[in-house]
C-alpha cells in the first residue's frame, strides 16, 4: 500500500483494513431510504456497506446526518458496535475544524458511557482510545473517570486505556491522570486492570510506576504473568538510568526466573544478565534459558534461546561448562537443527571434569538411534558420532571407551557416519600409539561389514600402515582375500564379473560388487595396501618361505584385479590402472629406497598433514581471540564529567555498547545512507530521492519529493513501472505541493522471486494559475532504481553438509560457469571476497583453505527467502605471474538465481 504524508504532518494510522470488492458504485439515495425507513436488519447491512466503502477510499459524507438521525438512536447492540467503527473511519474534521455534526455524536457517546449495559460502556471506552479529536474527548472526560469505579472489570480496564490515550495526546484534559491511576492501582484487584494501569504509569509517569513497584516489591512473584512482564521491563529501564538501584531489584528478578510464564522467565533472564555479570546471576539466567530450551515445544523459541546461550558462552565459558549436562537434555527435541546447535555448544564446553559424563550420555543417545522406532534418523547418529570424535580427541583418556563403541558403526550404510568413524580411527591410530593394537584388531574384525568404498579404502590403508605383528598381518590378508573371494575364483574374467554381478543382486552391498561395478580406484587402493602389507611382513622378519608365499598371493590378487579392469565394460581410470601395475613392479623389483618410501615416508607425510591441521586450527583460534572489538580512538562519555543538560538517556546505552565491544552497529549510518538513491537532478523543478527498505517478501520505497520552484504545483503524479518479477501494490495518489515544500510518499513493491529487478518512473505536474494545455504539462523522467538480488539471499553453510551439497549438486539442473577475472592475488582472500559479494556461506572448512599449494577448491551455498537453494564451486590456481585463474560454477534449481548470481560475480570480480 502507498500513503502520502506532507511535511510537518503525521500520517494517520490505519486501524481497520477489510478487503472489499466494490463492484457497483454506492447508491446514496437507496442507502438513505434504508436508514430512514428500513428495518433494523436493513440498517445493519447498509451501515456495513457504508463502512466498507469508506475504508476502501470511497467516503459518503452526505450520509452522516441520516445516520445520526435514523441509526444512532437505535438501542440494538450490533448497530452500536457498527456505529463505533463508522465514527472511527469517517473524516471528523473539515478544514482543520471539527464538523458540527460531531457534537451530536459526542452526546450519543456520552449516553453510551453511562449505559446500564457493561458491554456498551466498555466498547465505547475502547473506541475512545482511537480518537484524536480533543473537542470530542473533552466533554466525555468526567464519564470516563467515573467508569474507573464501575463494578465490572471490563469497564474499568477500558477506562484505564481511555485515560491513557487522552493523557498521552491531550494531557491538559486530565492533568491529574498519573495520580488518579496510581490511586486506582493501589485499590484494584483485577489482574488485567492492574496491568493496564501499570502500563499507563510506566509510559506516562515512570516515577509513579517506580513508587508503586517499591511498595509491592515483595508481592511481585504472586502477580499475574501480564503484570510481571511489565515489571521486568520497568526494572530494566530504571536500572539503566539509575545504576545505584540495581541491588534493590536483583532479588525480585531472581524470583521471577521461576515464573510459570515462559515469556516472563525469558525476559527476566535477559534483564538479569544486563544488570549483573556476577557468576550467581549468570548461572541463574543460563539455568532459566536451559529450562526454556528443554520444556518449550516451539522450535523457534528453542533456536532463540540457543542463540542466547551461545552469547553467554562467549563471555562466561566456565559457567556453561558446569551446565553442559543440563543443556544435553535438549537433545530430546525431534528437530535436527536444534540438536546440531546443542552439540556445538557442548563441543565448546567439554572439560576434563565433564568429558566422562558427556561421552556416557552421547553413547546412550547413539544406542537409541539403533531402534526402528527412532524418528531423527541417520543424520542425528552422524552428528553424535562427530561430537564424540572431536571431544574425545581433546581428552584421550576416554578413547579406550570410545573406540569400541564407534567401531560398531564402520558398516553403517549412511556414508557420513561411516566416513567420520574411519577418519577418527585413522587420526587416533597415528596420534596415540598405545591404542594401535586394539584399533587394528577391531578394524580387521569389522572389515567384512564395511559397505562403503571410501571407508574400506581408509580401513585397509590404516591396517597396512600400522599393523604391528605377523599374526594381525596374516589375519588382515585372510580377511581381504575373503572379501574378494568371488573375484579370485579361477574362471574367465568376463564370467567372474557377470556371476559376481548376478550374485550381488540378491545379496547386500559388498566390496566385490563395488569393484565389479567399476570402482577401480578402490581396486588400486586394495592393491597398494596389499603391497604395503608384504613390505611390512618383511620388516617384521617373516620366514623366507612364508615371504615368498605371501608375495605370490599378493601378486595373484593384484593381477586378477588388473585383468578384471581390462575386461570390464566400465572404463578404467588411467591413474588407477597405472597404480596397480606399479604395485606389481615394486613387488618384483624392490630395494631399500622403495621400501623406505612405502613404509616410512608415507607415514611421515600423514603425520605432517595432521600437524598442519593442528597448526591451522591454532592459527584460526588465535585470530578469533585477537580480534579487536573496540578501536582505541572510540570515545566513551563519562557521566560524572558531563553536565545534566548534556546527558541523554541514550548515552548510557551507547557507552555500554562501546565498552563491551559490540561494534556491529558502528557503520549503521553509513549503511543507511548507502540505500538512498537519487532519482532526479538538482536542476530539475522537482527533486526526488528514494530510500529502499528491503523486507522479506517486499520492498518499501520511502520517496522524498522536493518542490524547488516558487510556484504551487498541482496534480503532482508519481508513476512507477517495474521490470522483472516485481509488482507495484498500489499507486501513489496525486497531491499538491506549495512552493519550496517537501513531501514524502511510500510505495510498496512485491517481490516474487530471486531476480534482479528495475524500477523506473516519471513525475508529472501542473503549475497553478496557468491555463491548462498540453504545453503546461511538465514531466521529469526519473533515474532507474536497481533492486539487488543479494538482499534476498542468506548464507546456508550451517544448513548444509558435504553429502547434502553433493546430492543437491547432482540434482540441480541449471548451471552458470563464470571465468575468474580479478586483480586479487591471494587465493583464500578471493574465496572470502566471493562469499561477501554473493552473500553465500563457505562450506569448506577454514583449515582446508590455504595458499600453500597454489591451487584451491571451495564450496559455497546459500538459500533465498523464497526457499531457493544456490550452490557454488570455486576452482582456482595461482599462475606464475601471480594472477589467479580458474572457474566458478553456480548450480541452482531455478534459472533466475543462477543467472543473477553469475552476473553479480561478473560485475564485482575485479573489485577487492
From Swiss-Prot:
Q: How the protein sits in the membrane?
A: Peripheral membrane protein
Something else the entry says is: Brefeldin A does not induce dissociation from the Golgi of the beta-COP and presumably the other coatomer subunits, but DMSO does.
According to its UniProt entry, the function of this protein is described as:
The coatomer is a cytosolic protein complex that binds to dilysine motifs and reversibly associates with Golgi non-clathrin-coated vesicles, which further mediate biosynthetic protein transport from the ER, via the Golgi up to the trans Golgi network. Coatomer complex is required for budding from Golgi membranes, and is essential for the retrograde Golgi-to-ER transport of dilysine-tagged proteins.
InterPro entries referenced in this protein's UniProt entry, alphabetically:
ARM-like, ARM-type_fold, Clathrin/coatomer_adapt-like_N, Coatomer_bsu_C, COPB1, COPB1_appendage_platform_dom
**What Gene Ontology biological process does one annotation of this record name?**
intracellular protein transport
Between which residues do disulfide bridges form?
none
Per its record, what are the GO molecular function terms?
A: structural molecule activity
| Subunit structure, as described in the record | Oligomeric complex that consists of at least the alpha, beta, beta', gamma, delta, epsilon and zeta subunits.
Coarsely, its chief localization is cytoplasm
Q: Which Gene3D superfamilies match?
A: Leucine-rich Repeat Variant
Q: What is this protein called?
A: Coatomer subunit beta
Species classification: Eukaryota, Amoebozoa, Evosea, Eumycetozoa, Dictyostelia
Tell me the ranges holding the HEAT repeats.
Answer: 59-96, 100-135, 136-172, 244-281, 300-337, 339-375, 397-434, 441-479, 550-575, 576-612
Its keywords, alphabetically, are: Cytoplasm, Cytoplasmic vesicle, ER-Golgi transport, Golgi apparatus, Membrane, Protein transport, Repeat, Transport
Subcellular location, in the record's words?
Answer: Cytoplasm; Golgi apparatus membrane; Cytoplasmic vesicle, COPI-coated vesicle membrane
What's a GO cellular component annotated to this UniProt protein?
COPI vesicle coat
Q: Which SUPFAM superfamilies match?
A: ARM repeat
Q: Which Pfam families match?
A: Adaptin_N, Coatamer_beta_C, Coatomer_b_Cpla
What top-level branch of life does the organism fall under?
Answer: Eukaryota
